[in-house]
Amino acid sequence: MIYYANPSAATACFITDSAGRLLAVRRAKDPAKGTLDLPGGFMDMDETAEEGIIREIREETGIEVEAVSYLFSLPNIYPYGGMRVHTADLFFAAQVSDFSSAIASDDAAELVILAPDDITPEDFGLESIHQAVGRWLARKKNQNR
């Protein structure tokens, strides 16, 4: 029997409000504890990527998102328990009217609402998230031309 070392599936979401602000979370746990992150996490068995990110958003922010749209994916290596876990990180977007019902919980120590001009990829501690934020900002800039 041959075993293929395939990546684990993980999700993250760019959640914006009607003012165009981005909802980020401050990581409560290592790796990259204390840095900014996007709501998201590993998918559970028997759930779609969309179900997984909607669940993670609810767990980390308390926000009930009804729909997400797929943006892009990035390969990643996630340090966990002394291991290097290869992941396929799937990035989504969601829009909400406001963040008034949001509350930090689960892996999120704090919620951080960022105005578009205050979003800096380097503030996001995990490499794939850092890359994704840069890519997302470039897309936004191109859309506004």
Protein language model features and the residues they cover:
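Acidic, metal-coordinating catalytic segment for phosphate/diphosphate chemistry
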Residues: 1-13
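A generic structural signal for short beta-strands and their flanking turns/coil linkers
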Residues: 9-11, 21, 32-34, 66, ...
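Conserved positions in beta-strands of structured domains
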Residues: 14-16, 71-72
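Conserved hydrophobic "DFG−1" position in protein kinase catalytic cores
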Residues: 15-16, 24, 94, 113
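Conserved Nudix-box catalytic region and its N-terminal flanking loop in Nudix hydrolases
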Residues: 17-59
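A structural microfeature
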Residues: 24, 69-72
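Unchanged
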Residues: 43-67, 74-128, 132
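Charged phosphate-binding loop/patch that engages nucleotide di/tri-phosphates or the phosphate backbone
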Residues: 129-145
